[in-house]
Curated annotation (Swiss-Prot):
The chain crosses the membrane at residues 4-24, 42-62, 155-175, 197-217. This is Protease HtpX. Its EC number is 3.4.24.-. GO terms for cellular component: plasma membrane. Its main location: membrane. Binds 1 zinc ion per subunit. It comes from the Bacteria. GO terms for biological process: proteolysis.
Length: 295
């Protein structure tokens, strides 16, 4: 579950870097028809290619990046009974969910957390923190693992990549329309694209990407409810509720890097506008949704 902010940050970085490289190479000149007006058809194709390209590059490297960022120890040969139990539990849940066996790992953090990421249902990683293993009993850890396996089985990362690709396309498209307008109307540049276009486009990309993340975060919150339900089916509803209640009782701040904080099962807390940018619903809402499920 530690996937959203790292995915978004990687996407934004790729879009900005691509914009800089393309500008330096002069590729963006194809978007200026006759030196006066934008070729909107070419712009839309350009935006879609690089919007979806950035999104799927992020997806392709998500597992590798998560391993490096969180220093995950992937369990290949179990060193103890705990690692053996983790492998057996994930293997059983993956079989029940109808997916290939994910890699299973542990990362060192006092923060009770877990995440799933990967390119596809059959090429995924499920990892838990040492803090989660220390603070939760076996039933609760089983429920958390079920939640993460459900994310993989639901294809959340691929779906997120598609949504992010659409969002990226509009961000790139609209940013260049705004840049073109500022360059022509405000700075009265009548030929080609001047510095105003370049600067405005980069700033607009960042602003639009932040605003567009509200859409992605809303989607993420809905998928969390679905993953909770999946975890309840794989491990048992009471176990899933107990795990979330244990997380709610934890008041220590997250020890994850800022760009990874929303990937974890704990999620975050926020009210008002801040809630729009949360990748997870409040734990209270998630617990209520589970309790409302039919037994």
């Amino acid at each position: 579950m530690k996937r959203i902010f790292l995915f978004l940050a990687t996407n934004l970085a790729i879009i900005v870097v691509l914009s800089i490289v393309l500008r330096l190479l002069g590729v963006e000149r194809i978007l200026d028809e006759s030196g006066t007006n934008l070729n909107l058809n070419a712009l839309l194709i350009f935006a879609a290619v690089f919007g979806f390209g950035g999104s799927f590059i992020s997806l392709a490297i998500s597992k590798w990046m998560a391993k490096k960022t969180m220093r995950v120890h992937v369990i290949e040969q179990p060193r103890n009974s705990t690692e053996q139990w983790l492998l057996e539990t994930v293997r059983r849940q993956a079989r029940e969910a109808g997916i290939g066996m994910p890699e299973v790992g542990i990362f060192n953090s006092p923060d009770p957390n877990a995440f799933a990421t990967g390119m596809s249902k059959n090429n995924a990683l499920v990892a838990v923190s040492t803090g989660l293993m220390d603070r939760m009993n076996a039933d609760e850890v089983e429920a958390v693992l079920g939640h993460e396996v459900a994310h993989v089985a639901n294809g959340d990362m691929v779906t997120l990549a598609l949504i992010q690709g659409v969002v990226n396309t509009f961000v790139i498209f609209l940013a260049r329309v705004v840049g073109h307008f500022v360059d022509r109307v405000v700075f009265k540049n009548e030929q080609g694209h001047g510095p105003a276009f370049w600067i405005t486009t980069i700033v607009a990309e960042i602003v639009f990407a932040i605003l567009a993340s509200i859409i992605v975060m809303w989607f993420s919150r809905q998928r969390e409810f679905r993953a909770d339900a999946g975890g309840a089916r794989l491990a048992g509803r009471e176990k899933m509720i107990s795990a979330l209640e244990k997380l709610r009782a934890v008041h220590t701040p997250s020890q994850m890097p800022d760009q990874m904080a929303a990937f974890g099962i704990r999620g975050g807390m926020g009210q008002g506008l801040k809630k729009l940018f949360m990748s997870h619903p409040p734990l209270e809402e998630r617990i209520m949704a589970l309790k409302a499920m039919q037994r």
